[in-house]
Each structure stands twice: as C-alpha cells, then as structure tokens.
C-alpha cells in the first residue's frame, strides 16, 4: 500500500493478480498485461516475449483472459503463446510498424485462406499464398535491419 507522494518500490505479480481480479469483479472481460518503465530508475528485465509470464500468471490466478505484449515478434511466437494457454491474445506494435501486412502475410504462410484481404492487396495475397505453397519461410522481426547512411565526408 502507498500514500500520496510515495513511490512504489516493488510491484509484484501477486499485486497484479489482485488488481486483475478486482477489475474482473467489476466487469472487465480481458486484461491487457503490459509492464512499463514508469520511473527513471526502473530496470526491467527485457528480452524475447519478456512480459508473457505476467500475462500467464494473471490468466491462471485471476481466472480472466489476458492479452500478452512485449517483444513478441513472430507469428510462431504468437501461436506458441496462445497454444500453450499463456495468454488469450497477443498485442503487437513493432512488428506491424516494420511490416504493416504482418498479419496478412502470416495468414498466407499458415494457409489460412479465409483471411479477408483488402481489394488493393489481392495480388499480394496470391503471391504470398504461392510462396507459402512453394515452401518459402515467412519470418518477421520487430526491428528491421537498416543499413547505415554513408558519410557525406
């Protein structure tokens, strides 16, 4: 507990579960789980899918669906998280910034043909499906490589 003008030094998974349970009790259908760097001295552990354990704990202990976020960069990671029951949905930011067609390409790669593509993208849909049939692997990263700009010297 804290009072006005105090800083929370430690916020545990158990605290998050208690808050999620209270939100569920007041009608929340799903909890978006994201741990942010909210203070200058925060030093969170950062790595691949680093916030998924938080979503999983809340999902299991508060018995409420969760949305996982945090350095989830591929369709394979998403499928693993969902199939393992670690979260109910995944939120992506950088992968969609790097590739606005991330979801459409992943659908083609996995052979999910009912995915609706906007009319202007239909030729890309055909190409993506043909490439998937020919065995091309689909990979997406959240931070695409950008070649350095040559010096003007």
Task: Briefly describe each language-model feature range.
Residues 1-153:
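Flavin-dependent oxidoreductase catalytic cores
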């Amino acid at each position: 507990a804290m009072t006005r003008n105090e800083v929370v030094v430690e916020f545990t998974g158990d605290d998050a579960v208690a808050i999620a349970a209270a939100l569920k009790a007041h009608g929340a259908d799903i909890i978006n789980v994201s741990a942010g760097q909210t203070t200058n001295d925060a030093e969170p552990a950062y790595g691949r899918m680093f916030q998924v354990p938080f979503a999983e704990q809340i999902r299991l202990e508060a018995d409420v669906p969760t949305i996982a976020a945090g350095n989830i960069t591929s369709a394979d990671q998403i499928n693993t998280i969902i199939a393992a029951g670690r979260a109910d949905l995944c939120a992506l930011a950088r992968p969609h910034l790097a590739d606005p067609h991330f979801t459409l390409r992943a659908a083609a790669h996995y052979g999910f043909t009912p995915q609706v593509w906007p009319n202007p993208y239909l030729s890309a849909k055909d190409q993506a499906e043909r490439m998937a049939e020919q065995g091309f692997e689909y990979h997406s990263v959240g931070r695409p490589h950008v070649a350095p700009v040559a010096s003007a010297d």
